[in-house]
Amino acid sequence: MTTLFFIEHANGQVSDQSLKAISATSQIDGDVHGLIVGSDIDSVVAEASKIEGLSKLMHVDDDSFNNILAENLTQLILNVSGDYEYFLAAATTTGKNVMPRLAAKLDVSQISEIIAIEGPDTFIRTIYAGNAIATVQTSDPKKVLTVRPTAFKSAAMGSSGCEITKINAENMPSISEFIGEELTKSDRPELTSAKTIISGGRGMQNGENFELLDKVAEKLGAAVGASRAAVDAGFVPNDYQVGQTGKVVAPELYLSLIHISEPTRQW
């Protein structure tokens, strides 16, 4: 059994979400291969090759992967899919965009946001907004999975790299093109990887009061989150939202202020 894990990167570094999610592969027997794509990514390829547990790293250095499109990445994985039984990625925006398409192309079911692996065909995931845990068994010959990063610790980095292979981007579809993106800039840590989070709800009453949380967060080195009600009221932008319809978080310290209900939905 061989596993292929898609590794994401940003700003010249392997993403924290991928480092955590790839730890799930240690619960699967057999070799683990990584796939990383982009252009001018020699330094991040060198870093990724040192992830413990990887026996091989494939990379594509091509301008067409400067911005990930589901159609292109899916086709790239399909080009090498014959060698693999398991396909994993972190349950990020990219992972949630690509893996369902891959599953459809392979004519198998996709299992979302697993938090543990019990056996070769048995996986654990949360349901009902985290209030119940489901054990899912599949008879599909190929398993396509997204992994909840917050359920795993970051993979260790070794002192030497694994085998590195460069592959070519061939037969890439052209049914969509990247137009642009708008990124929110913040001095605060990213919510999904923050160790400390301070979060406010509708009781904050307005956006000006939310700025008080920023001052506390600065002292704590924390990220700032918000409930859906606070976001819907326009107090803060959408990317602040935590919970069932927002970002899944698992900090070491979570401070929930001013009317945030059902905190289990935030984990």
Predicted segments with their positions:
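Short, glycine-rich nucleotide/cofactor-binding loops
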Residues: 3-18, 205
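Histidine-anchored nucleotide/phosphate-binding helix
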Residues: 16-28
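Short internal beta-strands
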Residues: 32-39, 225-227
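A glycine-rich helix N-cap at a beta->alpha junction
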Residues: 47-70
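N-terminal glycine-rich phosphate/adenylate-binding segment common to multiple enzyme folds
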Residues: 65-151
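Phosphate/diphosphate-binding glycine-rich loops and adjacent basic-rich segments that engage nucleotide
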Residues: 129-189
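Glycine-rich phosphate/diphosphate-binding loops and the adjacent beta-loop-alpha structural elements
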Residues: 183-244
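Single conserved hydrophobic/aromatic residue that forms the stacking wall/gate
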Residues: 259-267
